[in-house]
Amino acid sequence: MNYAAPWWLPGGNLQTIWAALRSRRFLGDQPVFRRERWTTPDRDFVDVDWSVQPKTAGVLRRAKDGREAEKSMGAQPLLVVFHGLEGSSASHYAEAFADVAHSRGWVCAVPHFRGCSGELNLGPRAYHSGDFAEIDWILKRFAIAHAGPVMAVGISLGGNALMRWAAEEGAQARQIVAGVASVCSPLDLAASGWAIGRGFNRQVYTRMFLRSMVPKALKKLDQHPGLFDRDKLLAARDLYEFDNIFTAPLHGFKNADDYWERASAKPHLHRIAVPALALNALNDPFIPPGSLPQPASVGKHVTLWQLATGGHVGFPSGPFPGHVRAMPEAVASFLASQL
């Protein structure tokens, strides 16, 4: 990917924040998503938002059953987008990927991690960065139901989970997906967790995430009294403390340190046996450049794109106010080359 940030957006923070809030996400009409609810293996649910081309949207709209809707989209390639921390199909990158998918004649789907679709999930759990088991059943359902090839991209947290899944599946992943990609993913969770907990990051990004995550966690406590210590959660001031109190114990980890170590994809990248792309920006405020994987530590199936600029899932391009299609276009080109 050849990319240089526009002169009017210097620095990783501006490239991150402006891209998310102000840059254009699509060329024509805003992508329209239509929702299906899937029952999980543990009898919970996830919501999957499909964005399809107009000629297919009518077919999907008429479908009454979720699986019927999945099968109604023909043999076009399917791009599955796993969102980032507290993301959704409304995130700037999700709409941009959907727009790029449409321009290529692809179908796009955004499965929401539990509790991220606007409705709290049922079980005594949420989602986490290393949940390759969740990625597994979701991708396998897509592969079974969809007649065409399946590709997957994960953004930030979703990309780490996707790469963990690819590593766990090994050569079997080729039976499910043609290729995978991670974008600005914290493949070393400890390094990224500490980076986001300091200085400007702590004051801006950490506060933003906690404003969303803490109320959802408290609703989860109302659902399941005694699940965790309410006072300790309210005292959490960074993601480490939040993960220590909520994310780690609810998902089978001893504490935040254990979670960050075991969930990180970086130590497992050499096990990936499906075409995979790991795209990062060296000025990403969330991810120290020294924590990024190097060619010698990944397998032959993993391609590393490490760009000088772009911020965290930003990569704005063009004259003011800019657009964010350059990154999805480049990632889609990589995935298309695997078909």
Question: Language-model segments: what does each one mean?
Answer:
Residues 100, 114-151:
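Catalytic nucleophile-loop/oxyanion-hole region of alpha/beta-hydrolase
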Residues 272, 278-280:
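Short beta-strand/loop motif that positions the catalytic acidic residue
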Residues 16-55, 62, 66, 316, ...:
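N-terminal cap/lid segment of alpha/beta-hydrolase-fold proteins
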Residues 298-315:
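Catalytic histidine neighborhood in serine/cysteine hydrolases
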